[in-house]
């Protein structure tokens, strides 16, 4: 039997899809090259934006069309959309949708449902917990779900309440990855700063980082995503002493206006966020700062939008992931009066993206002439690419092997990547 996995959304979904791929292969299934060759499609869905949900529905509808013509493939739908829009999935996919697995279920529960669905009678019981190991870097989720309940966000409904993995389980997985040759570990959580709170750990997040940082074979350590309200000075001070932590901080600000931040239920102010960035830069002189921003939140005035423009100019983010507000389910923000017209949202998005691209280009071009360290992720015909400690993409010239750690001198740059040449 042939399968194809289609993944939408975040790194957490990428991680889960990798686990599920390993499971399918372990029970004798073969990965199809394309959807048309598959007997079934496993969709791992994302509900953060309306566009992501619509993308899933379009794909499920396409599978249904093929199913009506050829009797295959069928769909299995998992992830966040499966939690909040099961009726819509069944309406679009009809009899081609054979199984829906909610995003609130953990990997063990998904394993049991898949076993039952495929009537697998015997296989190695531990196989579903194995991580695909042939990678320069690996994502390792440490906490699932979210308890922050921002007014615009559907993740708590789609993913459930926060649930931390035991630290021993995380360290065991990371050790296996490092022993297999992985060089960079990226710890994941919807709000990773909350790691361990449900386990009764007062400083669980920084203690986890400290434990991972000590592991043999680790070259780089990263984490995402942090909630600014849960980042404290003590954590930053302890981070400064970590040998392998990379100087890249993703801190979603969402808005530069205090009234909008309050409506979003973000639990911090513009002033607090600016102080936090200042404290990060004090301790990590070469840190890159990236962020998420929503424009066109309900009732946002032109002046309030301009507050966000001003914040972006003041902080000079290395990158901003900018989205126009999208109504999600029955979240409080979706039900608010004062919804902004689409044309206004698009214009604000266009303006802010233009500003950010100019800032990113300027910051990247300031790297010209400098030498930086890159771990090679891909190499072919005298060219390779990898990422800097600040998580910037570098495309460079030189004959190297995948997973080599090399020095590269930057000679050009734009808003998308740096260009360099091998120096050794």
Please name every model-derived segment.
Residues 47-52, 182-211, 215, 227-234, ...:
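Conserved glycine-rich "GG(E/T)P / GGGxP" loop and the immediately following alpha-helix
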Residues 335-424:
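Terminal RNA-binding accessory module
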């Amino acid at each position: 039997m042939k399968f194809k996995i289609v993944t939408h959304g975040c790194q957490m979904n990428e991680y889960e899809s990798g686990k599920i791929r390993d499971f399918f292969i372990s029970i004798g299934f073969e990965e199809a090259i394309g959807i048309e060759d598959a007997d079934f499609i496993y969709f791992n869905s994302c509900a953060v934006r309306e566009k992501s949900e619509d993308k899933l529905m379009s794909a499920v509808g396409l599978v249904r069309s093929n199913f009506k013509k050829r009797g295959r493939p069928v769909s299995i739908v998992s992830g966040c959309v499966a939690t909040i829009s099961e009726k819509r999935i069944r309406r679009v996919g009809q009899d081609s949708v054979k199984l829906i697995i909610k995003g609130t279920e953990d990997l063990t529960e998904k394993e049991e449902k898949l076993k039952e669905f495929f009537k697998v009678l015997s296989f190695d019981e531990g196989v579903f917990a194995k991580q695909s190991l042939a990678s320069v870097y690996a994502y390792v989720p440490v906490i699932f779900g979210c308890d922050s309940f921002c007014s615009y966000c559907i993740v708590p409904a789609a993913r459930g309440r926060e649930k931390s993995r035991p630290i021993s389980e995380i360290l065991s997985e990371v050790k296996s990855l490092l022993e297999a040759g992985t060089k960079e570990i990226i710890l994941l959580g919807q709000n990773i700063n909350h790691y361990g709170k449900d386990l009764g750990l007062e400083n669980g997040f920084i203690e986890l980082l400290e434990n991972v940082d000590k592991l043999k074979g680790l070259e780089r350590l990263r984490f995402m995503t942090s909630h600014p309200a849960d980042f404290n000075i003590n954590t930053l001070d302890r981070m400064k002493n970590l040998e392998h932590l990379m100087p890249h901080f993703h801190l979603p600000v969402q808005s530069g206006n205090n009234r909008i931040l309050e409506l979003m239920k973000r639990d911090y102010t513009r002033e607090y966020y600016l102080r936090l960035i200042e404290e990060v830069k004090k301790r990590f002189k070469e840190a890159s700062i990236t962020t998420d921003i929503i424009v066109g939140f309900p009732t946002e005035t032109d002046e309030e939008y301009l507050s966000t423009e001003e914040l972006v100019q003041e902080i000079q983010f290395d990158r901003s992931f900018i989205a126009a507000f999208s109504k999600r389910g029955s979240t409080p923000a979706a039900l608010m009066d004062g919804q902004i017209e689409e044309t206004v949202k698009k214009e604000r998005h266009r303006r802010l993206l233009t500003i950010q691209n100019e800032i990113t280009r300027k910051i990247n071009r300031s790297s010209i002439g400098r030498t930086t360290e890159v771990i090679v992720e891909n190499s072919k015909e005298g060219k390779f690419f990898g990422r800097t400690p600040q998580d910037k993409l570098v495309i460079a010239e030189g004959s190297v092997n995948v997973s080599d750690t090399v020095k590269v001198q930057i000679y050009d740059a734009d808003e998308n990547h740096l260009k360099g040449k091998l120096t050794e």
